[in-house]
C-alpha cells in the first residue's frame, strides 16, 4: 500500500495537464508537453546570467543574493521536469519552489527594504527564522494536501506584488523607476495567459494554438528576472558606503528599454 502511494506521485500524467497535453508526445515521444517544457529555458538561464554579471559584488559584499536566484533556476528545472512528465511530484515541486523563492527573497533582501519597520531591525534574525519556519510548515501541509499549494501561492504573491511596487517607487534610483510598472505589466499579461489556458482550452484547441501556458513561462520568467535586477540595484545602492562598485541598468538588444528587452546590470569599480 505504501509503495503504491509513493508510486502515485511519480506516475506519468498523475499531475495537472495543461492545454498543450492534447498534443502530448507528438514532438518527442518522451516529453508530454514540448512547448511548455522548452519555454522554461529562460527561467533557468537568466538568473545565472545575473549571478555571473554580479559575481564580484556577490563575492566581496553580499553573497546571500545568490540564493533566491539559484532557486529561480531550480524552479525552471522543476517546471521542465513537471511538463515533460506531468507527474504529481513534479507539479508540487514546481509550485512549492515558487513559494520558497518568495520566502528566501524576503529573507535575503529584507534588510534593504524600506517598508520593513526599523524598530524590528534588531530582531532581524528572529523575523527571518519565523518566515522560514512558517514556509516549511506550509510546504509540509502542501505535500499532505496538494490543493493547498494554489492557496499558498496566492497568499504569498499578492503582498509580494505590493512590496515590489512600493520598493521600486521609493528606491530613488532613476534606472529602476519604471521597473514596478514593467514587472506588474509582464506579470499581469502572464497570468491572463495562465488563466486563459486553463479556462478556455477548448477554444485554443479549436484554433490549433494551445500554447498560452508556454507564453506564460516566457513572460513570467522575464518578470522574475527583472525583479532580481531591481532588487540587486537596490541592494548595491543601499550598501554603497561599504563597497567600491557602481552599477547601472543596461538593455539588450538596443538601449531603449522596451518591455520585451532584457535589462542587465553593468557593474564597475568606482574610480579612485
UniProtKB/Swiss-Prot annotation:
The chain crosses the membrane at residues 34-54, 61-81, 96-116, 124-144, 148-168, 183-203, 214-234. It is an enzyme of class 3 (hydrolase). The keyword Nucleus does not apply. Keywords: Glycoprotein, Hydrolase, Lipid metabolism, Membrane, Metal-binding, Transmembrane, Transmembrane helix, Zinc. Its EC number is 3.5.1.23. Its main location: membrane. Its cofactor is Zn(2+). GO terms for cellular component: Golgi membrane. It catalyses: an N-acyl-sphingoid base + H2O = a sphingoid base + a fatty acid; an N-acylsphing-4-enine + H2O = sphing-4-enine + a fatty acid; an N-acyl-15-methylhexadecasphing-4-enine + H2O = 15-methylhexadecasphing-4-enine + a fatty acid. It comes from the Eukaryota. It is a multi-pass membrane protein. Pathway: Lipid metabolism; sphingolipid metabolism. The keyword Iron-sulfur does not apply. One of its GO terms (biological process) is ceramide catabolic process. GO terms for molecular function: metal ion binding; N-acylsphingosine amidohydrolase activity. Pfam families: Ceramidase. It is found in: Membrane. Glycans are attached at residue 256. InterPro entries: ACER (IPR008901). Zn(2+) binds at residues 83, 213, 217. Belongs to the alkaline ceramidase family. Hydrolyzes the sphingolipid ceramide into sphingoid base and free fatty acid. C.elegans contain specific sphingoid bases, which are unique or different in structure compared to the sphingoid bases found in other animals. Two examples of these distinctive compounds are: 15-methylhexadecasphinganine and 15-methylhexadecasphing-4-enine. This is Alkaline ceramidase. It comes from Caenorhabditis elegans.
Amino acid at each position: 500500500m505504501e509503495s503504491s502511494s509513493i508510486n502515485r506521485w511519480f506516475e506519468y500524467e498523475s499531475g495537472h495537464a495543461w492545454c498543450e497535453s492534447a498534443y502530448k508526445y507528438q514532438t518527442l515521444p518522451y516529453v508530454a508537453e514540448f512547448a511548455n517544457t522548452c519555454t522554461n529555458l529562460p527561467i533557468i538561464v537568466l538568473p545565472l546570467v545575473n549571478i555571473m554579471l554580479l559575481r564580484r559584488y556577490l563575492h566581496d559584499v553580499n553573497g546571500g543574493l545568490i540564493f533566491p536566484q539559484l532557486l529561480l533556476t531550480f524552479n525552471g528545472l522543476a517546471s521542465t521536469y513537471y511538463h515533460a512528465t506531468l507527474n504529481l511530484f513534479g507539479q508540487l515541486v514546481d509550485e512549492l519552489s515558487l513559494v520558497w523563492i518568495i520566502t528566501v527573497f524576503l529573507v535575503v533582501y529584507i534588510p534593504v527594504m524600506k517598508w520593513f519597520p526599523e524598530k524590528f531591525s534588531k530582531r532581524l534574525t528572529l523575523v527571518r527564522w519565523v518566515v522560514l519556519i512558517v514556509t516549511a510548515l506550509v510546504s509540509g501541509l502542501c505535500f499532505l494536501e496538494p490543493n493547498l499549494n494554489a492557496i499558498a501561492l496566492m497568499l504569498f504573491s499578492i503582498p509580494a506584488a505590493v512590496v515590489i511596487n512600493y520598493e521600486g517607487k521609493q528606491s530613488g534610483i532613476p534606472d529602476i523607476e519604471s521597473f514596478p510598472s514593467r514587472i506588474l505589466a509582464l506579470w499581469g499579461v502572464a497570468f491572463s495567459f495562465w488563466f486563459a489556458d486553463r479556462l478556455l482550452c477548448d477554444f485554443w484547441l479549436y484554433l490549433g494554438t494551445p500554447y498560452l501556458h508556454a507564453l506564460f513561462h516566457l513572460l513570467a520568467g522575464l518578470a522574475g528576472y527583472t525583479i532580481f535586477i531591481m532588487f540587486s540595484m537596490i541592494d548595491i545602492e543601499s550598501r554603497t558606503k561599504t563597497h567600491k562598485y557602481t552599477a547601472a541598468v543596461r538593455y539588450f538588444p538596443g538601449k531603449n528599454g522596451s518591455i520585451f528587452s532584457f535589462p542587465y546590470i553593468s557593474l564597475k569599480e568606482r574610480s579612485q
